[in-house]
Amino acid sequence: MSFLDSLFGKRQRSSDIARDRLLTVLVHDRVKLTPDMMEQLKAELSTVIARYVPSVDAGAIEVTLMRGEAVDHLKADIPLRRTSQKL
């Protein structure tokens, strides 16, 4: 690994990117979640979580499906806005 690779990271090959995209499509197909259903899931997650955690950044929620070795995973990345209050 050269110094520049360690500094900037190694770029993914287009074949790796295409493989990841294909796996994502296959997982979505297997789980039967359409893009509209994913958007609805995001909206409902933000509504429910905002009831308990008011600092949820609803516009930045990301929901992804990932293929695991034994099971598929639904991952929700829910960022919170920082508040000026100290704990």
UniProtKB/Swiss-Prot annotation:
The lineage of its organism: Bacteria, Bacillati, Chloroflexota, Chloroflexia, Chloroflexales. Transmembrane segments: none annotated. This is Cell division topological specificity factor. Keywords: Cell cycle, Cell division. Prevents the cell division inhibition by proteins MinC and MinD at internal division sites while permitting inhibition at polar sites. This ensures cell division at the proper site by restricting the formation of a division septum at the midpoint of the long axis of the cell. GO terms for biological process: cell division; regulation of division septum assembly. The gene is minE. Belongs to the MinE family. It comes from the Bacteria. Disulfide bonds: none annotated. The keyword Hydrolase does not apply. It holds the Pfam family MinE.
